Structure formats: structure tokens, C-alpha cells
Amino acid sequence: MKEIVKTTNLTKRYGDICCVNNLDMSVKEGKIYGFLGPNGAGKSTTLKMLLGLVHPTAGEIDMFGQRFTEKNRISTLKNIGSLIESPSYYGHLTAKENLKIYTTILDLPDSNIDEVLKIVRLDRQGNKKTSQFSLGMKQRLGLASALLAFPKLLILDEPTNGHDPSGIQEMRELVKSLPKKYGMTVIVSSHLLSEIDQLADDIGIIANGKMRYQGALSNLHETDKNKSLEQIFLDLTGKDMSL
């Protein structure tokens, strides 16, 4: 199966601190890749390197079958949507008006606005000022902005932050529908084992900047049938990652 993202010996150091250490990642086309690890494991730093927001100390990144470089950064990023940090908006503007800023900058048709709002189930709140949005609604609007260009690859960092249990389930269903409906490949990072377990096809487990496991989630379940999935993660990471 075609690889959309491949990293080789990807490393990021800040002084003497190694946040990401010789990371080899493989994300296959049309799959949901769960990137799992405890807080501070290096997940966000890795995703920021994939988006060109942080420059690697060493290693290589291949995206869509070609080396990701400074020269092709802009053209590559046109095929990527992302929700990396809690989104912020102009509170005095409506959801549609905030998204209009993105379509103008990215030279996208305004018709995409109504379409993505419908996808994230905010179509009835499109004319509502974002200052009146809950944190969960703002996260969904952030997902809408990431979807505006209908990218080949979607990168989501802790997308269920700020959601109540029903909101978490709704966001999960939204993300799971994207590969089938729109042919997208999705990378989702989380520190919540239960969330990734219900969402991902393939999984990468990172701890202390190193990849501890990578492969099909179903294979991880088969690793040791006498152990719970939570215990397997504990063995791999040295940290409790259950809810």
C-alpha cells in the first residue's frame, strides 16, 4: 500500500534535550494512523516537523512520494490540512466569516464553507458569532478550517480536547468518515488509549521521543492475549495510558 508519509531517523534536539529520537514513521494512504504516547513523548513536535513548523535536527521526511524540503514546502502543504493547537477566532465574527478569511487567503471557493460546516455539523451555527461557541464547537470549527481545501492528508493533534463524552463520540465519528467519504489519510495524535483504540487502523506508539511500536492496531491486540491493551501500552511506554 502506498505511503503518504514516511520519516527516516527523524530527530529533533533542543540543546541537550532530544525530543524526537531517530523516529521512523510510515503512514499508509487512506488509513487513520493513531499516534499515541504520554504527554511530553514527542508527538506534537513530530507533527510540527511534518508541517514544516519545526525544522528537524536530523533525518528525512517524505510526503506523497517525494522528499519534503524547503523548496517544495508550500506546494506540499497545499495538500495537507491540520488542527495542531486549540484554534482561535475573531469572536466578533461569525463562523462563516472566520472561514471566509481562510478561503480568501487560500484562494478557495466560498461554497466550500457551507460544505465543511455541514461535515462538522455546524451548518446551523454558521451565522453565530464564535464568541458564543463552546470549546468543543471551536474544535469542530477548527476541523472545518482544516477541511476547507479537502486535503489529501489531515493532521489532528488531540482533536477531542474540550469535548464532553458525547462530543468526543461525535468527533470520532466525523474523523472516521473522512477516508471513506473523501479519500483522505488522517494522522490523529492522542494520549488517550481508549480514543485511539476506537478510531485508528494503524498505530504508532512513542515514548521519550522513540517509536516503541508501529503497525496495525489489530496486531497489537494479538501481541499478548493474556494482557489487557492497557497493560501492553504500559509495558511499551512505562506509563499508564488508560483513562
Regions of interest found by a model, annotated:
Residues 100, 104, 110-125:
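Conserved ABC ATPase "signature" region
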